């Protein structure tokens, strides 16, 4: 299916791995010009190489700490200077940080909010003047179902993800007059670098518990009976960014194999 993304300009934060990289690949395959941002330049370079080799379309990798507003401003400027505008912003950067209240430090809380909330605010704030000039502008925030139905011991992530969902709804109304659509995808259990790292920290040298065993254990709570692949989330992001989803705004869409108890 041609989604109508040919020539569109997209910025994806947290784009060097996992869901962000998958979304970048999907958009690039559809003909979009994609800039991916992350902190680790070596991982960015590898992602750019991987995507370019598969699509032969322009891809930028820009090292950016989205917790720093000046760095985000520079990211936006570099993309605009290179390609002339912005049509799509995907606020994807973030990691899982979970704790019970009695164990959570103020530093942990602050760090999570800076990354997931301030990062999205900075990106949207500085991309907005250019998104207003686009004829098909889209903002997509990635959150989790836990932002709608948090479990015990999942703060501060539950707080920051709920904020992301709230910002999505607020911005969808605030920016509608400029024909800017804003949606969020709520990501469930997806095979990602974060989960691989979690397995490696405790089981990499344990031959009795492989990474596949880890995925199988995680899948037991998922109604579809498996852990999702990054490209399954990336393809949904790509669709939401396209004109094929032109009447979808203010939505929060679960990509979780049916795990969440809420819609």
Q: What is the predicted role of each segment?
A:
Residues 2, 149, 237-238, 249-263:
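Short C-terminal tail/terminal secondary-structure segment
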Residues 9, 16-17:
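Conserved glycine-rich cofactor-binding loop
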Residues 100-101, 105-113, 218:
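Substrate-binding pocket helix/loop in short-chain dehydrogenase/reductase
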Residues 124, 160, 168:
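Active-site helix of classical SDR
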Residues 129, 173-177, 246:
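Alpha-helical segment proximal to the catalytic Tyr-Lys
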Residues 144:
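Residue(s) in the substrate-gating loop at a strand-loop-helix junction
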Residues 184, 208-244, 248, 255-257:
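C-terminal helical subdomain
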